[in-house]
């Protein structure tokens, strides 16, 4: 499955990408898709069997699963 995680800070996005790569998941930093919002404008895109929420940094804004042309929110930190 394909996932997108958004963050409140660029550092949090970088930490999460490194944590996912440490778990053997290919992850990339990218601009946040227009359909989603983010405080810092940077997201992490990754593919995995599950969303690996335990690998997210503390400043994660939300995690979405890609479904067709849209996204399903799996986690939102307000």
Language-model-detected regions and their locations in the chain:
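C-terminal structural segments of small proteins and small subunits
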Residues: 45-78
